[in-house]
Amino acid sequence: MSRSVGSLASCYAIGLMALWAGVAQADQGPGAQDQGADQFQGVAPQVSGIPTCFDTNHVVLEINNIQVEYWKTTTPNQFHSRAHVRGPVVRIYNDHSGHNHISVQIGRTADVAIELIYNQEFGALPDLAVGAEVETCGDYITSTAQSGGYPASPDGAIVHWVHRSTRPGHESGYVAISGVVYGY
């Protein structure tokens, strides 16, 4: 069964990449070379000064926007994994209980977004504006329904633990806003 799910995930990701690459080519006109498609192909170059993101097995985790988008639409509430996403801020939610809540676009349109939850105990974030470029590494959770005391995310999924780890055996995360790293 996992083999067929993996195959389905691969087909879905390949289809998204083809769609996005085609849209990017169309946006630039015939014969144009796509300069920004790497953001949507699951692998992107690291910006200097930004830490390496690791999965739960301490393997380098490249930008995985496509995988995260797939998880959002196919996994049950409270599914957990690691995410390393990059995109522009599309909404800024009210801060509460010492956390910033930021909606970051991970797909081709603003409605394909994930809620980034940043713990202010690891330092203040700058004043944010819609359009600011964000890269983040942390724990992904599908959040489509309330779980315990936590409400569902307005984006249907979250990335949290986006700061240095205070727990042995748990990978660190971070938030980079316009190339400046926070929480690490």
Where are these regions (language model features)?
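Bacterial N-terminal signal peptides
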Residues: C11-W20
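Sec/Tat signal peptide C-region and signal peptidase I cleavage site
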Residues: G22-A26
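Bacterial N-terminal signal peptides that target proteins for export
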Residues: M1-Y12
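OB-fold and OB-like single-stranded nucleic-acid-recognition modules
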Residues: D27-Y184
